[in-house]
Design a protein with these regions (language model features):
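Hydrophobic alpha-helical bundle cores within soluble ligand-binding/oligomerization subdomains
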Residues: 26-421
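N-terminal mitochondrial targeting presequence
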Residues: 1-31
């Protein structure tokens, strides 16, 4: 744009017709502030039929089923189906769903090439985010190819298949990237219809068929426990993106990027780092006292919603204990975790119990997962929950656009040198 003398004169005439400028108050706000809560704490930001967090003070339900019942009676695939479609699958529906998941376990060639170019030094969360973007290019969601132009391509997939490909494909992509850069192997990630996501992931990660049922069960239960948790930051991010009428892959990329942040994801990795600082014979009480005195952030304890207990914690704690007692287990890790918990509850003023992340750390370690993979496994699980919320947000059909409380300066006159011009 060019702003010569004639243009400036024209704009002055336009502004003169607009009337007096509305001045901000001295407090900086042009209107009385509406209800405001930092971090949206306690704010109801939408409706959902997917999950209740904190029912009865410390309960957790997916589509009306308690987390305890689901962990006792279901595998992750059944829970993913429940979250996305609203009901637990019949045996026939589950068989069909497993077959569809298996179709997407082979990593596409273009994705393999990309993964081979992502260095081992990269954050595994960035690997998954990049995988999601690449899959969105290779298999665009039908109806979301372009704005106002062609809405599908020969490689377009349905919304349903887009979700299925992500839930099934994240684990194999992560394992392919890891194997290529640690051993130089281009692994075949094909599976079978009856192989669970947990079993398939461990087989590809550890490169062995000899995996104990206890380890498979632990990872499977963790996927159920991490699958959904209401309007958590990543889920809300996916809903915001969805509300703009964007595609599935963009919404999931938003969620992954949000979960990458250490205040949302990464707590189980931080818990493992804490546990690794001690040995069984160490003065854990003294070490924890020092950390608290230095006001260090202790991850793996407490939750914004659960004030008494995290209902998921006892389930994963039992898995950690069972693994520690098995052949080749790490009883030292479980013992150290127990002592840290005991000391924390003794020293911490509010007596906040451990959350899901704390005992997940030792459980994942005993399953053979590298610590940087803890949060990516969270992604594999939570993609099912994100899918449910994306579908729900699309049905709502309203753009999420909250207001903000202005705290900047009040109205100011232009500097003298600008007035003169």
């Amino acid at each position: 744009l060019s702003f010569g003398p004639r243009s400036i004169a024209m704009w002055r005439r336009v502004l003169a017709r607009c009337g007096p400028v509305r001045r901000l108050s001295a407090a900086g706000s042009a209107a009385p502030a509406k209800s405001y809560s930092k971090g949206l704490a306690g704010v109801i930001a939408g409706e959902t039929k997917v999950c209740t967090v904190g029912m009865g003070g410390d309960g957790l339900h997916y589509r009306g089923y308690s987390i305890e019942d689901l962990c006792r009676a279901c595998e992750f695939e059944e829970v993913a189906y429940l979250l996305i479609y609203g009901d637990l699958p019949t045996p026939a529906q589950l068989k069909s769903y497993r077959a569809r998941l298996n179709e997407y376990r082979v990593v596409p060639k273009a994705v393999r090439v990309m993964l081979e170019h992502i260095p081992l030094s990269a954050n595994p969360m960035d690997v998954l985010r990049s995988t999601c973007s690449m899959l969105g290019c290779l298999r665009p969601e039908t109806g979301y190819l372009s704005n106002g132009g062609e809405q599908s391509s020969p490689t377009s997939v349905s919304t349903d298949d887009a979700f299925t490909s992500l839930i099934a494909g994240f684990g194999p992509a992560l394992c392919y990237w890891h194997a290529f850069h640690t051993s130089g192997k281009r692994i075949d990630t094909a599976g079978s219809d009856d192989e669970s996501i947990a079993a398939h992931f461990l087989r590809n990660l550890l490169q062995t068929d000899r995996i104990s049922p206890d380890k498979v069960q632990t990872v499977d239960l963790s996927l159920i426990l991490y699958a959904e948790h209401g309007f958590a930051a990543s889920t809300f991010a996916s809903r915001v993106t969805t509300s703009t009428r964007s595609d599935v892959y963009s919404a999931v990329c938003s969620a992954i990027g949000t979960l990458r942040g250490t205040l949302h994801g990464g707590a189980n990795e931080a818990a493992m780092e804490l546990i690794s600082q001690f040995k069984v014979d160490d003065d854990i009480e003294g070490g924890m006292r020092k950390k608290l005195a230095n006001k260090e952030l202790i991850m793996g304890f407490g939750h914004r919603i659960y004030k008494k207990r995290d209902p998921r914690s006892d389930i994963i704690k039992a898995c950690s204990e069972k693994l520690s007692e098995a052949e080749g287990g790490r009883p030292d890790l479980y013992a150290i975790s127990q002592r840290i918990e005991k000391v924390w509850l003794m020293l911490e003023e509010k007596k906040i119990p451990p959350n899901l992340d704390f005992y997940t750390a030792s459980a994942y370690n005993m399953c053979g997962l590298p610590t940087p993979f803890f949060t990516p496994v969270f992604v594999i699980a939570r993609t099912a929950g994100w899918a449910a919320h994306i579908l729900e947000e699309r049905a709502a059909g309203k753009l999420i656009r909250p207001s903000s409380l202005y705290t900047g300066p009040g109205s100011r006159a232009l500097p003298a040198w600008k007035q003169a011009s």
